[in-house]
UniProtKB/Swiss-Prot annotation:
List of residues binding anthranilate 1: G81, N112
Amino-acid positions noted as binding Mg(2+) 2 in the UniProt annotation, renumbered to this chain: D226, E227
Name of the featured protein: Anthranilate phosphoribosyltransferase
Cross-referenced NCBIfam families: trpD
InterPro entries for this protein: Anthranilate_Pribosyl_Tfrase, Glycosyl_Trfase_fam3, Glycosyl_Trfase_fam3_N_dom, Glycosyl_Trfase_fam3_N_dom_sf, Nuc_phospho_transferase
One GO CC term on file: cytosol
Cofactor details (free text): Binds 2 magnesium ions per monomer.
Reported function: Catalyzes the transfer of the phosphoribosyl group of 5-phosphorylribose-1-pyrophosphate (PRPP) to anthranilate to yield N-(5'-phosphoribosyl)-anthranilate (PRA).
Amino acid sequence: MTDFKTIIARLAEGRALDAAEARAAFEIVMSGEATQAQIGAFLMGLRVRGETVAEITAGATVMRERALRVTAPANAIDIVGTGGDGVGTWNISTATALVVAAAGVPVAKHGNRKASSLSGTADALQALGVNLDIDPATIAASIEKAGIGFMFAQAHHAAMKHVAPVRADLGIKTIFNMLGPLSNPALVKRQLLGVFAAEWVKPFAEALRNLGSDSAWVVHGSDGMDELTTTGPSAVAELKGGSIRVFEVTPEDAGLPRASIEDLKGGDPEQNAAAIRRLLDGEAGAYRDIVLLNTAAALIVSGKAATLKEGAGLAAKAIDSGAAKQTLAKLVAATNGKNNV
């Protein structure tokens, strides 16, 4: 096995790690065999030089192998972002996940508490009454009954406890900010994945291809959002059939108006939960529009829609029919041990 000091020495020279070296390094880190100082040096060495697709793939592979697994249908999708975009919007991926499920696509959503906003996916779902403290069998049953299940990252990646103190002490983005969205415990092969910078859309798509995904959109909004934005264009790297295509989309492609970033600013978990409820009740406005856009993308990834315009229409129908509101009610019931779903 590669010695961890040797790996750190290679990083200190500015060298990229090959797949075997990177895998060995993450095995050492995630098994608790590295000291806190070594982990800090490792993370900083990667960050200063710039993380490679091979290193990201290796880290995500090790995290997936060590995760507490969940069973999900083969056509399930994850709708997830790296977080840390600093924009502080409403919970867009959370609301999108509910609408996608209501449109008939099973969702195995992986997420955590807030990164840079006031409210992360876990915070908002908890405020909506979803029980996060459930076992893999209950999550699988939730996906079956409600069409959606939520996997709380910290409950599924126990090995992260070895790096948590160092990450907190460093206070900067590290490779682990990238690995979470790539480490879905249900091993889904379809993703709508938002990243914190445009230069990462293609590398993330390449990593997803390496990890076995068959269909994905990796996106970044021109306003900095780790979502498709309605304030302007968004960069997209599409993975389909083993090929990656990079292009740009606008809200107009989905027949939607542009919004200002102020219209999309979120609040604390309770405020964001209330906004989701209003959205599911059919409230019009900028929040609904951005959820329609992101749902449309997820429906393209899932093969349910051919275009953003078609997908946005299906998303609107899922909300206006009451199906999305019912999906939330089913999710709350399924995670709280109630059978009336």
